[in-house]
Amino acid sequence: MVKKYTGQNVYDAFQQRMHFIFKEFDNIFVSFSGGKDSGALLNLVLDFQEKYYPDKKIGVFHQDFEAQYTVTTEYVEKTFARLENKAELYWVCLPMATRTALSSYEMFWYPWDDVKKDAWVRPMPQHPYVINMENNPITTYRYKMHQEDLAKQFSRWYRISHNNKKTVCLLGTRAEESIQRYSGILYKKYGYKGECWIARQFKDVWTASPMYDWL
């Protein structure tokens, strides 16, 4: 598909998409990895929400992989501390299957494996918004499920726990990152009201990539 440029800049296009999202969906949360794209997305969404919907709280979902960059965890710590009274925070530290190339014998590694606590590479974060095996409210979670499934099932649980109303997970995905992401956004079989950057996951659960055309 040939790119077609318009006279609108990506920031104004993002604002337009946010108006659409907040109008169409009852429950909104941001998937925040602690990386630059999801960090930019989170701050842009919060700025929009504070300006146009000051009485509405959004959710922030962080999927902790235990063995991740120290500066990433530090950034997540600072961000969550700043948002503690401004957003619904979900810092998920549950056992999940992640593919590994570090072993010749095992296909998966399990962050936060509750039967191997002595092998954890860092201590469990200690905050009231941290979700682990001792306090897990996510009813759609299955023990040691794949990491991708955990993220999807969190979205489903978020809808269930918020009155089963229409829910959207905002992603910092950019089409420019790779051909796979480019085609994944532009060639979606099922969009939402003609918008290719929104995709259906489950009944009344969607994902949206409002920064998809950012460079």
Residues covered by each model-derived region:
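Nucleotide-activated chemistry modules centered on ATP-dependent adenylation/adenylyltransferase
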Residues: 1-31, 36-215
